[in-house]
Design a protein with these regions (language model features):
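N-terminal beta1-alpha1-beta2 submodule of the flavodoxin-like/Rossmannoid cofactor-binding fold
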Residues: 1-98, 146, 154, 163-167
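Short histidine/acidic/glycine/proline-rich micro-motifs that form metal-
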Residues: 77-79, 126-131
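Short hydrophobic beta-strand segments
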Residues: 1-5, 119-128
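Glycine-rich phosphate/pyrophosphate-binding loop and the adjoining helix
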Residues: 128-167
Length: 167
């Protein structure tokens, strides 16, 4: 399975997102309501390992990430960071790791819960990022890839939503 996490509105997704094989994708994007913010309760570690205890339709991200071979994020960036929606969903994905620590790539990180290591591809559609903001964003993606145990990562910058995004 491939996982797509995006922050596009329904109309923008319909207009700019072109997916050749929708059946192979689990698609997570903004819904009718906003996702509940992570409250730091660690219920996804203790009460329902691998699944967020906040049942709002976005609580299965840990399972999706644990079973995907490729993880694509489409996001707008402000100041070199993920959009608020994407950051919120990634925060809610902490269930992909265990609460204890191990050394990975010479750094201390949480032990991975799942054995697969998806490829991470991030497409950033902001049109006014400075070079410093782009560097910050690339570093954020690299850190996210390490935290999620991704095998590879890449970042593509496109100039706003003036072209189709092909997957």
């Amino acid at each position: 399975m491939k996982l797509l996490l995006h922050d596009l509105s329904a109309s923008d997704a319909g207009q700019y997102l072109s997916i050749s094989d929708k059946q192979s994708f689990q698609i997570v994007g903004p819904a009718e309501k906003s996702p509940v913010k992570c409250v730091g309760c660690f219920g996804c570690w203790i009460k329902t390992p691998g699944e967020c205890v906040l049942k709002d339709g976005f609580n299965h991200m840990g399972e999706y990430l644990g079973n995907c071979e490729a993880f694509t994020i489409i996001t707008q960036s402000r100041y070199g960071e993920f959009s608020c929606f994407i950051k919120n969903i990634l925060d809610r994905s902490i269930s992909t790791v265990h609460p204890y620590f191990v050394k990975r790539q010479g750094e201390i990180h949480h032990k991975l819960r799942y054995q697969n290591h998806p490829e991470l591809q991030v497409i950033c559609y902001s049109s006014d990022l400075s070079e410093e903001e782009k560097n910050t964003f690339e570093n954020r993606v690299k850190a996210t890839a390490v935290n999620l145990g991704c095998s590879t990562h890449s970042v593509t910058f496109i100039n706003g939503l003036d072209q189709s995004i092909l997957l």
